[in-house]
Structure formats: structure tokens, C-alpha cells
Design a protein with these regions (language model features):
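Exposed, low-structure sequence patches enriched in small/polar residues
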Residues: 1-264
């Protein structure tokens, strides 16, 4: 039966200790990794796979009551968690463009259980992160740098009659540094943001920055930075539910000019 015929509460504010400290949770973890490198080609790579799981002899549910957080425990049902993670990274020197690139990714899949409306529900989450970089010294006066990042998540409820939800956010950035004459360096950076906030709402934005540096001497630099050239001053969106509406609005720094005297 239950530990108590009601609520087990040990800390009025956070329930920082309690029933789970009295029990042992069976758990396991298995991992494997491999690396490869070829110095002559400038190739470095690494791959790791890890799988772990645990089992608890009870199910928990959290509820807010007044100013406290209360956990409810039921040891008649067991809960299980399984997770698999794969991560990899590749770095490569590319002589044809006088530069190199890198690609790193992490993927994880987790299956667990939660209590919703007094019913134990199984759910799965997939998380995918990708980061890439490519740089090139096209000439002695022009340097290009491209960076990208992607973060995606997927939530699935096998027991529910609904499609898995997929949300993501990605960023592409291109930076060009040009030195027309030796004392002057110009850097133009463009960024493209795209986010899928809900299944039917996608938000995107472009940002541009320009930086100029004049080397007066070995110890003195004059810098001028013109940021947010397109003057995008807000990142906002509104989502709608059956009986509700939620608006998110974030203030961004508008177009600005920053002058700097740097002493080395």
C-alpha cells in the first residue's frame, strides 16, 4: 500500500528530501567511444554512444498547493526510464579553400512515464543538436567564416491519439573580414534566425552588424561598431489555444553606433 494514506511532505518549500531517499533505484549505464585522426589530412573525429536506464518502485506526481510544492507517492506502480545518446564531432582541414571546417552533433532519445489526470502516461522525447563551422582565407585580405546551429525536439505520446510535436530553432551566420588597406579592417556579419514555435507558427529574423577598426599604431586602435543595421527592435509572437492566448514579446537593442578607443 501507500506509505501514508495521503501526502508525504518533508520540506514545506521545495520537498528537497523524502520517500525517494529511503529506497534503492536499480540503474545501469553502458557506453562506448571511438576516435580517429589523420594528421597528414588534418582530420580528427570522435564518436560516443551511451545507453542508460533506471527503475523506481513508485510513481510521483507534483502538485502546487498554496505556497508549497507537494509530491504524491504511490508505490503500487513502478516507473521506468530509458535513454540513448549518440554524439560525434569531425574536424577537417581543407587546403583548397585555405581553411577548414567542423561538425558536431548530439542526439538523444528518452522514454519515461508521468502521471497526468490520475493516469500513467508513457512518453518519448527526441533531442537533436547540430553545430557546424566553415572558414576560409580566400586571399590575404579577405577572411570568411560561416557558422550554423540547429536545436530540435520531438515529443511523442504512444498511448495518445495525436501526432508527435516537433519544434526547432536554427541560426545561420556569415562573417566577412576585409582589409582594403593595412591600417583598416572591416567586418560585416549577417545572422538569420528561424524558429518553429508551434506546429503552425514559424518566426524568422535577419540581423546585420558592421565593425570598422583603424590601427593608428601598435598600441592604439580606433573602433566603430554599427550594430543592428536593419533596426529590428522586437522579437514577439502570439500563440492561440482553444480558450486561451499567449503573447511573448522581447525587446531587442535597436540600431546603435559604438565608438571605442583601445589602448593595447
Amino acid at each position: 500500500g501507500d506509505l501514508f494514506e495521503g501526502q508525504w511532505m518533508t520540506d514545506y518549500r521545495t520537498v528537497s528530501s523524502g520517500y525517494e531517499e529511503l529506497l534503492l533505484k536499480p540503474a545501469y549505464r553502458v557506453s562506448a567511444s571511438a576516435s580517429y585522426r589523420d594528421l597528414s589530412r588534418g582530420l580528427f573525429s570522435h564518436l560516443m554512444i551511451m545507453h542508460h536506464g533506471s527503475e523506481s518502485p513508485y510513481k510521483t506526481r507534483r502538485e502546487l498547493e498554496d505556497s508549497g510544492l507537494i509530491r504524491l507517492y504511490n508505490d503500487r506502480e513502478r516507473s521506468r526510464m530509458r535513454s540513448t545518446m549518440v554524439s560525434g564531432r569531425v574536424n577537417l582541414a581543407i587546403g583548397a579553400i585555405h581553411g577548414g571546417g567542423s561538425l558536431a552533433t548530439v542526439y538523444s532519445h528518452t522514454e519515461s512515464e508521468a502521471v497526468a489526470e490520475e493516469v500513467a502516461v508513457r512518453y518519448g522525447t527526441d533531442l537533436l543538436t547540430i553545430k557546424g563551422m566553415l572558414n576560409s582565407n580566400i586571399t590575404s585580405r579577405l577572411f570568411l567564416l560561416y557558422e550554423m546551429s540547429y536545436n530540435g525536439n520531438r515529443l511523442s505520446l504512444p498511448m495518445a491519439d495525436r501526432k508527435p510535436s516537433r519544434l526547432y530553432g536554427m541560426t545561420h551566420a556569415l562573417e566577412a573580414t576585409y582589409t582594403p588597406v593595412d591600417p583598416l579592417t572591416m567586418t560585416l556579419r549577417g545572422e538569420y534566425y528561424r524558429s518553429r514555435i508551434t506546429s503552425d507558427l514559424t518566426k524568422q529574423m535577419v540581423m546585420l552588424d558592421l565593425d570598422l577598426t583603424w590601427s593608428v599604431s601598435r598600441r592604439i586602435d580606433l573602433e566603430a561598431g554599427l550594430h543592428n543595421l536593419l533596426n529590428n527592435d522586437r522579437w514577439d509572437y502570439t500563440t492561440y489555444g482553444l480558450l486561451s492566448r499567449q503573447t511573448v514579446s522581447r525587446q531587442l537593442r535597436g540600431r546603435s553606433l559604438l565608438l571605442t578607443l583601445r589602448l593595447k
